[in-house]
Structures are given as C-alpha cells and as structure tokens.
Amino acid sequence: MDRAPQRHHRTSRELLAAKKTHTSQIEVIPCKICGDKSSGIHYGVITCEGCKGFFRRSQQCNVAYSCTRQQNCPIDRTSRNRCQHCRLQKCLALGMSRDAVKFGRMSKKQRDSLHAEVQKQLQQQQQQEQVAKTPPAGSRGADTLTYTLGLSDGQLPLGASPDLPEASACPPGLLRASGSGPPYSNTLAKTEVQGASCHLEYSPERGKAEGRDSIYSTDGQLTLGRCGLRFEETRHPELGEPEQGPDSHCIPSFCSAPEVPYASLTDIEYLVQNVCKSFRETCQLRLEDLLRQRTNLFSREEVTSYQRKSMWEMWERCAHHLTEAIQYVVEFAKRLSGFMELCQNDQIILLTAGAMEVVLVRMCRAYNANNHTVFFEGKYGGVELFRALGCSELISSIFDFSHFLSALCFSEDEIALYTALVLINANRPGLQEKRRVEHLQYNLELAFHHHLCKTHRQGLLAKLPPKGKLRSLCSQHVEKLQIFQHLHPIVVQAAFPPLYKELFSTDVESPEGLSK
C-alpha cells in the first residue's frame, strides 16, 4: 500500500528537478528586453530580474510614462533606465502581460523554437570559453564574487559588453610593470593652456625620502614642493572631521609616486579621454534627461503611497536600484585603461570596497539642490519619500552628502575622474599586486590634475570631501541592512539581488549585536 505514495513522491521530485533544469537552460538566453542575463520567463517573456521588476511596478502603479524624444529610444542594459516609456512599450510589444503569468503548456512549435535558441546560446558560450584567457594565478583566491560582479561568465561578461562600445586599448606607458621601459624623467607632464602653465615634476629619489603626503591645499592652487606638487589638508566642518590614517582622504598623495616608468603627456591625455568616455558610456541616465525631469515631482498623494509601503517592500526596491547602479560602476571599471590588466583578485577587492562609494558620488548628478530632492523611479522626491525604510538618519546623511557635492558644481568629466580615483585606491586591504594598483592610481592622479589645470579648476582639490565620509556612509548602510536582515531574513534571502547580498549581506546577528 505504500508503493503508490512513494511512486508519487518520486515522480514529484523528478518533475521538480526537470523544472529546475528547464529554467536553468532558459537562463542562458539573454533578456529579450535589454539583453542582460535573464532569470527565466516572467509575464510571458524571457527577461532579467530588472525588467521583470520594472514591468511589475509599472502595472501595479499604473503610471503614465512619457518620452521626451521620438518614442524610439534604444533599450539595452545601459540605456534601459533612460526612457521608461520606450522600455514599457518594448515590454508590451514583445508580449509581456499580467495575463501571461500562467500561460499554460507551450505548443510543440514553441518548445522546439525555445530549445533551438538555448542550444545556440550554449554553443556561443562554449566558443567564448575556448578563446577566453586563463585568469592569472594570483586571482584564484577571489573567485567568490567573480560571478556576481561579472568578471567571469556572470552578469557582465569579461570582454566588452554586447550593447556597449568596446573599451580602447591602453597605451603601454600607463601599464608597464616596474623595472621595464624607459628610465624615469623628472618632468612627468607639462601643459600650457591659455597662458596658464602647470608643471608636474617628480623625482623618484626625493619621493622615497619624502613619503606620501596629503594632496589638499588650503588655497586650492598647484604649488611646487620639494618633490613636485603638494597640497595641505583641508577640513570640512559641515561633513565632520576627516579621519586620520593612510586612507584618510579621497585622493592619496600626489607627491610621492610609486617607482614606475615614465608616463608621457600623450599617455596622460589619453587616460583623461578614456576615463571621461567610460563614464559617459556607463551612466544610467544622461545629465540632460535628469535636468529635464527636475520639474517632475512626486505629488503629495504619491509620497503618502510610498510612505505606506511596508519596510520590506521599500528595502527590496532600493536594493534592486542600488544593485543596478553598481552594475554600471562595474562596467565603468572594466572600461578604465589598466583595470582589466590587474589580477582578478585585485579587481574584485577594488570593486567590492569602492563600488558603493562611487554610486554615492554619482548620486549628486540626480540630486536637485534647489528643493533637496533626488530622482527615484521616474520622478524627484525628498527624504520623506523613503520614510518606510526605517533609517531616516542614513537617508538624511546621503542627501546631505549629495547636497555638499552638488555645491562643488562638478562637470561630468570631473565626476568621471574623481570617481575613478575613488575606485582605484591602493590602500584597500587584501590587494595582491599593490604596486600595480599604485601605478594606475598615480596615473589617474596625474590625469585629474592635468584636467583641472587645463580648465583652471585647481581650487576644486581643496574642497573635496574627506574619504572618511564615504566610508562612514557605507558603514551606516551595512549596519542598517544588518538590522533589517535580522527582522526579515527570508526577504533578504529570497527577494534581494545576488550581487547585493554578496557585497553587503552578512550572517544574521543576534539582537545584542545590533545595538544602535
């Protein structure tokens, strides 16, 4: 009598296993909407988690989107957030529908077509794996985040993304290992623009003796010290006292460079162009679109609707938005000349430690200092919009930081170069080839100074916030996540994006460990 239940139980397990296999096979097909890595069939179409969530929110909120251009905006992984109207129209055109959640059995023709597409994608992946380079031996200890950061075969392919222009090759002068190439030159870069002269000088012997100095200047002017440019520390009372230590400022010492070969002015100018181009290609929203939307504010009723949402729903929404922003930062890093030449361990260390900091800096582009609002899900809203998160102090601190940065009147190129230096930081713990990171960081410092010198904006250096402020905001975010994770562990495990959990989530602590 027990045979029938056993047979039924075995059949159920086989069906479940077959369903999982079928789903995993479908996931090799990219999202039909934006081309990102898909996670299965959602609302009747193979899509990624981002497009699934976007379609769900558009149906729940019943929002009427509008297009500011010709209603034919390209929708791919990098541009999908630029026009919500065209993204929704593409979802509908490809067949996404709430009625398609349970669409019944596929016809044989549909199954055969799906199977053929799966096989095609698998063959392409096998070909890519055959031509892919073997990762450096020093990178094997960093495999845990390789998939979710997209530095292998995960969400963002190792090579150039299919929907973004390929990053151009890096000049050899920016990447040579120490001990190779031409000898040092005392004059590292010299530029004369519109009557202004900026002479950057470096002596390796002096550099060894001097040690690393701060690069901030009280008057913001480039001044020659004993070993080149020197800047004194600047304090910002409105942001709190900067922390002391080897990692206390946004940009490390400019004066004492690592022992690296000569980098020509041509190389430095190329690096400026590369960083700025990489930034433009990996911005979620164009600046002109953000400025155009500034008058599009959430109504009082819409703000109230957000405030009435459950804490877990708002956390899930923000986790998905933050993860998407971090994916753009990953693409930015991969396009920076020299980054992909670092060992994989160091790539992951830099991204893990710096991606959130870059997102916080980038946020100033979407912040309107006139009314203290930020662009979120299609409109501008203030701190009250995020009340349901239950972390008003953190949200206020992030808004204050964006307000401080917006007062600096960053140009797009200045944000690009600044965020590159926030990301490429040789003081991150765990680096295996620190000298190579120092080399890249030093050249980025040169590039930043060179650009500021050309645009007569050297005074900006004295106004940059202390690095301790960025670290403090990131630490507050992790602390609030730990509290939320303790209250809603299942939500974090089941609904939060894998990349977000890899970067920020920890084991659930006891209530005693979550003191205010």
Curated annotation (Swiss-Prot):
Effects seen without this gene: Mice show decreased adipocytes size and highly insulin sensitivity, leading to an improved control of circulating fatty acids. Mutants are protected from hyperglycemia and insulin resistance in the state of obesity. Loss of circadian pattern of some clock genes expression in the peripheral tissues and massive apoptosis of thymocytes. Knockout mice for isoform 2 lack all lymph nodes and Peyer's patches, as well as LTi cells. They also show a reduction of T(H)17 cells in the lamina propria by at least 10-fold to less than 1% of the T(H) cells.
Consequence the record notes for mutating residue 500 to F: Abolishes interaction with NCOA1 and NCOA2
Signal peptide as annotated in the record: none
GO cellular component: external side of plasma membrane; nucleoplasm; nucleus
Induction data: Isoform 1 expression oscillates diurnally in peripheral tissues such as liver, brown adipose tissue (BAT), kidney and small intestines. Isoform 2 is induced upon antigen receptor ligation in the presence of IL6 and TGB1 (via STAT3). Induced by TGFB1 in T-cells.
ZnF locations on chain (NR C4-type): 31-51, 67-91
Function: Nuclear receptor that binds DNA as a monomer to ROR response elements (RORE) containing a single core motif half-site 5'-AGGTCA-3' preceded by a short A-T-rich sequence. Key regulator of cellular differentiation, immunity, peripheral circadian rhythm as well as lipid, steroid, xenobiotics and glucose metabolism. Considered to have intrinsic transcriptional activity, have some natural ligands like oxysterols that act as agonists (25-hydroxycholesterol) or inverse agonists (7-oxygenated sterols), enhancing or repressing the transcriptional activity, respectively.
UniProt name for this protein: Nuclear receptor ROR-gamma
